[in-house]
């Protein structure tokens, strides 16, 4: 198994030195879901929630979060993102909203944490905007779907 890179030989946490790594095109895609009551789902779907356009605000929140990841995750490098795309898939049968965030850069370190942070904040924003009518919403299935670029190459989640 590969050693954890955020610890030195004495076991102390440190930010990994990426200075000698080649700048390459990096891409990451992450996803997650929030499940709610059917009536809450209808408010989200129809854009009629009391606080406004839930999906639109969640999209902006995801983009903002990707850009602030290094401020939230202690050992993440600040990254100049070149692209952030946020998609939502609404599944009426299960009253579930899925969020997919794709992040891109040309740099020396990956953008997986940015994609994952964007997903989490988008889903938390949906929760915040709908909690007045449904405190039982469940956020889950947050995961990295794929990453491309860098020394470790490409990776895709199974299934």
Swiss-Prot record:
<keyword id="KW-0456">Lyase</keyword>
<dbReference type="InterPro" id="IPR036522">
    <property type="entry name" value="MoaC_sf"/>
</dbReference>
<comment type="pathway">
    <text>Cofactor biosynthesis; molybdopterin biosynthesis.</text>
</comment>
<feature type="active site">
    <location>
        <position position="128"/>
    </location>
</feature>
<comment type="function">
    <text>Catalyzes the conversion of (8S)-3',8-cyclo-7,8-dihydroguanosine 5'-triphosphate to cyclic pyranopterin monophosphate (cPMP).</text>
</comment>
<dbReference type="GO" id="GO:0061799">
    <property type="term" value="F:cyclic pyranopterin monophosphate synthase activity"/>
</dbReference>
<dbReference type="InterPro" id="IPR047594">
    <property type="entry name" value="MoaC_bact/euk"/>
</dbReference>
<dbReference type="GO" id="GO:0006777">
    <property type="term" value="P:Mo-molybdopterin cofactor biosynthetic process"/>
</dbReference>
<feature type="binding site">
    <location>
        <begin position="75"/>
        <end position="77"/>
    </location>
    <ligand>
        <name>substrate</name>
    </ligand>
</feature>
<comment type="similarity">
    <text>Belongs to the MoaC family.</text>
</comment>
<dbReference type="Pfam" id="PF01967">
    <property type="entry name" value="MoaC"/>
</dbReference>
<keyword id="KW-0501">Molybdenum cofactor biosynthesis</keyword>
<comment type="subunit">
    <text>Homohexamer; trimer of dimers.</text>
</comment>
<protein>
    <recommendedName>
        <fullName>Cyclic pyranopterin monophosphate synthase</fullName>
        <ecNumber>4.6.1.17</ecNumber>
    </recommendedName>
</protein>
<feature type="binding site">
    <location>
        <begin position="113"/>
        <end position="114"/>
    </location>
    <ligand>
        <name>substrate</name>
    </ligand>
</feature>
<dbReference type="InterPro" id="IPR050105">
    <property type="entry name" value="MoCo_biosynth_MoaA/MoaC"/>
</dbReference>
<dbReference type="InterPro" id="IPR023045">
    <property type="entry name" value="MoaC"/>
</dbReference>
<dbReference type="InterPro" id="IPR002820">
    <property type="entry name" value="Mopterin_CF_biosynth-C_dom"/>
</dbReference>
């Amino acid at each position: 198994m590969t050693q954890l890179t955020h610890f030195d030989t004495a076991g102390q946490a440190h930010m990994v030195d990426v200075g000698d790594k080649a700048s390459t095109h990096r891409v990451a895609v992450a996803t997650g879901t929030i499940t709610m009551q059917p009536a809450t789902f209808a408010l989200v779907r129809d854009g009629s929630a009391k606080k406004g356009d839930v999906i639109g605000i969640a999209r902006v929140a995801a983009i903002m979060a990707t850009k602030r990841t290094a401020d939230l995750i202690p050992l993440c490098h600040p990254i100049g993102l070149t692209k952030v795309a946020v998609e939502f898939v609404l599944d009426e049968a299960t009253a579930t909203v899925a969020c997919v965030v794709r992040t891109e850069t040309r740099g020396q370190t990956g953008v997986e944490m940015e994609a994952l942070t964007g997903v989490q904040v988008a889903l938390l924003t949906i929760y915040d905007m709908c909690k007045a009518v449904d405190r039982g919403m469940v956020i889950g299935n947050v995961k990295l779907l794929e990453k491309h670029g860098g020394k470790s190459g490409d990776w895709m989640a199974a299934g």
